[in-house]
A protein has these predicted regions:
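Sequence-pattern detector for short linear motifs
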Residues: 16, 76, 108-109
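Beta-sandwich interaction modules
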Residues: 46, 51-54, 89-109
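Intrinsic disorder/low-complexity segments enriched in polar/small residues
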Residues: 4, 20, 29, 37, ...
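Disordered, acidic Ser/Thr/Pro-rich linker "stalks" and the adjacent N-terminal cap
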Residues: 1-52
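Aromatic, loop-rich ligand-recognition surfaces of beta-strand-rich domains
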Residues: 33-88
Length: 109
């Protein structure tokens, strides 16, 4: 069984929040496991999410869900150790659907 690498100590940052309305669309909704909430980025290309983990992690799957009609055409998973430069680990191409998608099956960061 796959275990989430997101824990209480995981620090997250996002590129933007829709209309800067963090109470309704902020990053706190990224991993809250509630269907009625979500992080919503503002307009523009190149939206991103940065996660800082308390220890080294190995990513085997990414579970991602978009609002239908607003998915990214291409996603890039990057990784690095603290104070190093980000490197591309893999790219993946989610479908433009409103369903939970499992995008990669094995990546070593």
């Amino acid at each position: 069984m796959v275990e989430s690498v997101i824990c209480a100590g995981t620090v997250s940052r996002v590129s933007s929040v829709l209309q800067r309305d963090v109470k309704q669309f902020g990053k706190q909704f990224l991993f809250d496991h509630r269907d009625e909430t979500c992080w919503n980025s503002d307009q523009g290309s190149c939206q991103w999410i940065v996660l800082e983990f308390t220890q080294k992690v190995s990513v085997s799957e990414i579970h991602i869900q978009f609002q239908g009609g607003f998915s990214s055409r291409n996603c890039i998973l990057e990784g690095c150790l603290k104070n190093e430069e980000l490197k591309t680990v893999t790219e993946f191409y989610p479908e433009d659907i409103n369903a939970l998608q499992i995008c990669i099956r094995r990546a070593v960061c």
